[in-house]
């Protein structure tokens, strides 16, 4: 995808013209132009010079953006250079317009005195209005230059409508002035007064002034849509304190190199990404993650640019600088996403391509019809001019991109990063969320959940023995016990003769006494385990936990249960999704017992266990038949499933936000950010619908009103000046409505509503993979296949004796024990 800057566009018709011109070039696969960011994305092998030439031939300017878009370049592109220019034009226009209105209407409506020179000097009055309105037109010559260029190139735009409306009023008034001069020479005072009433000089000037008012309001509001992005850029520190030969010195941020040591005092911003090498502190990372609670940082922990050091003094080694920092990557992602086009924008694009020519045609027909009905030339032209100036393709062109821009900004402030506009729109349509278990629903690291001691043995004594034994082990379950004990300041005794017995447990000596830890089969060899303790252990296992038994000598001490526990916000997030009408499914490669236990704790109703990575992809594709599916994972191991879903969400990215396979990147490891993503997507989609409705309904009502269609029914007719005022406000209203997205609370479920789906056949199919030993030939495959497919709930079985596996497609959940028994009864072994 190659990006270009495009200049000279004023409305949606310009966008359609540029896209049409570029799409005709050989080698261009797709072209997307954004009116809001004045940018163009082109996919294909076409030469950039050919693309730039095509844009120029269409009447616009184009230049190639740098391959590596620097944050400084993005910041420059977001600077509001348009509003100050428009403001100057507007002030000059209003000053001249005030004088014009004084001469044309002030003396009649307000009784303001005119210089005696103008008494009965109608020609002088007309000439003054001609000159003053001409000055306003010169001040706003941009409309005429752009508008008439569009006509010459057969690509009329919004400026064309304004130029035709104002120009027609001016030309007609000038002709009326000449006719009045002739009448005055002939002494026909009645004709003089009649022609005086045909002057529309003030309308010609007022149209330009009011359109300029609207353009300024629009430019100001458009600037507000990028506030979130600008806010991120302002966070980037300009200087850093680096340590050289033990001395600290402040340098510009550009001089910091990878590997430099930098110091950060309390209250200062961290200048670049790095790792703490000295000291400890609490860092506020809300700028990047939206999380206001400070995060403790110790030696070895990573820190990110633009986060705030709140307490201690720390020294860090720079690991990412310049455009590689997390902040710069986030800025680039938000900027790139805002420059892309959502599929829903195609509605406006199709209309915009024919909108301006259609309006010009309607205006001409309007004038002709009123003339044929016997109305005066002035009346007929007034109706045609009203049609020209009230029609607004700008609102259509801005309806989608402004909402996308604001939505992306809101997401960035909350640690939700969308790769493009398509991702944001798709998030609003999601009705099924597939969750990976490990690291997504659960924390991804084992933790102690239960401690069961025998009579006369305290928890402290059990933990002391357990930690003494486990601290020498590298097993994840051992680490969980050590962390648990350390948190409670329990230190185990030193051990000797430590030995890890593969598949069973651990053994060592404390002093002269042997201690053991491991599974039931191993520990029961050394100590008697009562039935009550064994029953408790089995109950813990049913809950998806791993019971570890410990004994000292031949005395059984107790059980410590360890499990990968669900995240604190896991249950709440799942319930929020359900309340939003979203179907939640958990896919995991773990065994069914563990998966069901985790799902029960997280309130997840649908579970598919024992699924290999390629099986996850198949399940996701199956679910896509029934709706829009989002796949949520915490790592790239599930990339096939991530890319096969309608929306791939990577959770807990931290500083690695540039994950190619994901459509949405969640910086924090919070499951609550998943419903927040969908909530934001829905709010943005709803806002786009509102904008498109307003843009369409405005023209649907406004154009017939301007034509005079309601004059005979209600006596309603629209003065061209009021038409210009309405046009100037239409785009402003669309942009202002988009700004309301800034008030969306993405983590609040207060206003959640269940989405209404079309009646769909409920999808109950799931896949499961079994490992089977003993199959030697196709005959064995057929036997196993027939056996499995005879089980109620198994729709089909793909069996391979070469792979030693069977992939089952099931219409309902079937217990592993049932499947295992059937296969083993047929003479084969299930692993």
Residue ranges of predicted features:
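Flexible metal-binding regulatory segments at protein termini and peripheral loops
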Residues: 1-124, 149, 247-250, 332-340, ...
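Juxtamembrane coupling segments of multi-pass membrane pumps/enzymes
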Residues: 2, 74, 183, 189-191, ...
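Conserved ATP-binding TGD loop and adjacent catalytic N/P-domain core of P-type ATPases
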Residues: 16, 29, 266, 430, ...
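Conserved cytosolic catalytic loops of P-type ATPases
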Residues: 26-49, 53, 198-199, 230-324, ...
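Transmembrane helix-loop-helix hairpins at the membrane interface
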Residues: 85-239, 350, 451, 715-720, ...
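Membrane-embedded alpha-helical bundles of multi-pass transporters
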Residues: 109-123, 152, 156, 171, ...
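Conserved catalytic phosphorylation-site environment of P-type ATPases
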Residues: 288, 347, 382, 395-469, ...
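P-type ATPase nucleotide-binding
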Residues: 448, 452-580, 592, 604-620
């Amino acid at each position: 995808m190659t990006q270009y800057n495009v200049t000279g566009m004023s409305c949606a018709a310009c966008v359609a013209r540029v896209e049409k011109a570029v799409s005709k070039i050989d080698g261009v696969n797709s072209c997307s132009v954004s009116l809001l960011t004045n940018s163009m994305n082109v996919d294909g092998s076409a030469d950039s010079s050919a693309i730039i030439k095509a844009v120029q031939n269409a009447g616009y300017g184009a230049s190639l953006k740098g391959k590596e878009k620097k944050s400084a370049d993005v910041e420059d592109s977001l600077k509001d250079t348009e509003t100050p220019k428009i403001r100057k034009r507007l002030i000059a226009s209003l000053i001249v317009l005030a004088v014009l209105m004084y001469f044309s209407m002030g003396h009649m409506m307000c009784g303001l005195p005119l210089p005696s020179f103008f008494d009965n000097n109608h020609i002088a009055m007309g000439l003054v209005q001609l000159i003053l309105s001409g000055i306003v037109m010169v001040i706003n010559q941009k409309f005429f230059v752009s508008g008439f260029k569009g006509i010459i190139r057969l690509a009329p735009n919004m400026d064309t409508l304004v130029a035709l409306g104002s120009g027609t009023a001016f030309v007609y008034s000038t002709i009326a002035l000449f006719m009045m001069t002739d009448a005055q020479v002939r002494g026909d005072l009645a004709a003089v007064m009649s022609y005086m009433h045909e002057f529309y000089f003030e309308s010609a000037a007022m149209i330009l002034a009011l359109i300029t008012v609207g353009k300024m309001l629009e430019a100001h509001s458009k600037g507000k849509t990028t506030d979130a992005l600008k806010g991120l850029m302002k966070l980037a520190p300009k200087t850093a304190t680096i340590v050289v030969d033990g001395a600290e010195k402040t340098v510009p941020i550009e001089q910091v190199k990878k590997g430099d040591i930098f110091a950060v005092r309390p209250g200062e911003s961290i200048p670049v990404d790095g790792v703490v090498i000295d000291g400890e502190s609490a860092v506020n990372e809300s700028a990047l993650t939206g999380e206001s609670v400070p995060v403790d940082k110790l030696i070895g922990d990573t820190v990110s640019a633009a986060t705030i050091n709140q307490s201690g003094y720390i020294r860090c080694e720079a690991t990412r600088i310049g455009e590689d920092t997390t902040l710069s990557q986030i800025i680039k992602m938000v900027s790139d996403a805002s420059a892309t086009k959502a599929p829903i924008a195609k509605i406006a694009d199709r209309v915009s391509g024919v909108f301006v020519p259609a309006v010009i045609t309607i205006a001409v027909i309007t004038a002709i019809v009123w003339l044929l009905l016997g109305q005066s030339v002035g009346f007929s032209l007034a109706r045609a001019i009203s049609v020209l100036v009230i029609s607004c393709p700008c609102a259509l062109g801005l309806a989608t991109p402004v909402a996308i821009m604001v939505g992306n900004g809101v997401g960035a402030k909350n640690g939700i990063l969308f790769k493009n506009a398509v991702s944001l729109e798709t998030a609003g349509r999601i009705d099924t969320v597939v969750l990976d278990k490990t690291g997504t629903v659960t924390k991804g690291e084992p933790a102690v959940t239960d401690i069961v001691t025998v009579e006369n043995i305290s928890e402290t004594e059990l933990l002391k023995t357990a930690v003494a034994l486990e601290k020498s082990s590298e097993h994840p379950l051992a680490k969980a016990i050590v962390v648990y004990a350390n948190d409670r300041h329990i230190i185990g005794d030193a051990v000797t003769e430590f030995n890890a017995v593969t598949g069973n447990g651990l053994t060592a000596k404390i002093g002269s006494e042997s201690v053991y830890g491991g599974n039931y089969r191993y520990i029961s060899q050394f100590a008697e385990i009562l039935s009550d303790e064994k029953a408790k252990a089995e109950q813990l296992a049913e809950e998806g936990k791993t019971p570890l038994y410990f004994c000292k000598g031949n005395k059984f001490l107790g059980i410590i249960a360890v499990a990968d526990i669900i995240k604190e916000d896991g249950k709440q997030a799942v319930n929020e999704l359900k309340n939003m009408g979203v179907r939640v499914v958990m896919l995991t490669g773990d065994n069914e017992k563990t998966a069901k236990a985790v799902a029960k704790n997280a309130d997840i109703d649908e579970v598919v266990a024992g699924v290999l990575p390629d099986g996850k992809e198949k399940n996701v594709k199956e679910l896509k038949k029934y709706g829009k599916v989002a796949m949520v994972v915490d790592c790239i191991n599930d990339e096939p499933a991530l890319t096969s879903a309608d929306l791939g969400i990577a959770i807990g990215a931290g500083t690695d936000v540039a994950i190619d396979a994901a459509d949405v990147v969640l910086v924090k490891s919070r499951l609550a950010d998943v419903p927040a993503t969908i909530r934001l997507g829905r709010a943005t989609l709803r806002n786009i619908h509102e904008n498109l409705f307003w843009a369409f309904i405005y023209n649907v009502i406004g154009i017939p009103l301007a034509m005079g269609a309601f004059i005979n029914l209600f006596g309603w007719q629209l003065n061209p000046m009021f038409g210009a005022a309405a046009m100037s406000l239409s785009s402003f209203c669309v942009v202002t409505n988009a700004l309301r997205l800034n008030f969306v609370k993405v983590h609040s479920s207060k206003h959640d509503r269940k989405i209404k789906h079309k009646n769909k056949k409920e999808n109950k199919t799931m896949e499961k993979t079994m490992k089977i030993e003993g199959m030697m030939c196709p005959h064995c495959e057929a036997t196993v296949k027939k056996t499995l497919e005879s089980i109620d709930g198994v729709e089909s079985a793909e069996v391979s004796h070469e792979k030693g596996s069977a992939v089952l497609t099931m219409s309902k959940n079937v217990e592993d024990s049932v499947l295992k028994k059937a296969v083993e009864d047929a003479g084969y072994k299930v692993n």
